[in-house]
Structure formats: structure tokens, C-alpha cells
Amino acid sequence: MAKDDVIEIDGKVVEALPNATFRVELDNGHIVLCHIAGKMRMHYIKILPGDKVKVELTPYSLDKGRITFRYK
């Protein structure tokens, strides 16, 4: 996937699900299912419900995404 094809949007983690999957509410009100990006997994960055995160969505599937950053 080319880097310029992704849509980046901020959101808030609503629920933690099994297998490092999270339900995230985006700033526009949509709820998407997200998994953690590989670099975040590699560096053991923990994500809890209530955290503000940056999510990447593809134009092909707007109901699934990848968490790429956790704001402090």
C-alpha cells in the first residue's frame, strides 16, 4: 500500500478487544475497528481505553484501521 493512499484521522479508544484490537471513535463520530501498527507493537507501547490516538484508514475499507500513534 502506498503511503499517500492512507487517510489519517484522530480518535479516542473506546474499548479494548482481544488480539491487540481496539474499537476507536473518530473525531467525526464514526466507530472503527483498529489494530496496532508493527512499530508500536515492537516498542511495547500500551494503549488503554480513553487514550487519544492517530488512526490510518485506507480508502478501500473505512471501517477498519491501524493505530500509528498514541498522544501523551
UniProtKB/Swiss-Prot annotation:
Keywords: Cytoplasm, Initiation factor, Protein biosynthesis, RNA-binding, rRNA-binding. Residues 1-72 form the S1-like domain. It is found in: Cytoplasm. GO terms for cellular component: cytosol. GO terms for molecular function: ribosome binding; rRNA binding; translation initiation factor activity. Its main location: cytoplasm. InterPro entries: NA-bd_OB-fold, RNA-binding_domain_S1_IF1, S1_domain, TIF_IF1. HAMAP family: IF_1. This is Translation initiation factor IF-1. It comes from Sulfurovum sp. (strain NBC37-1). The gene is infA.
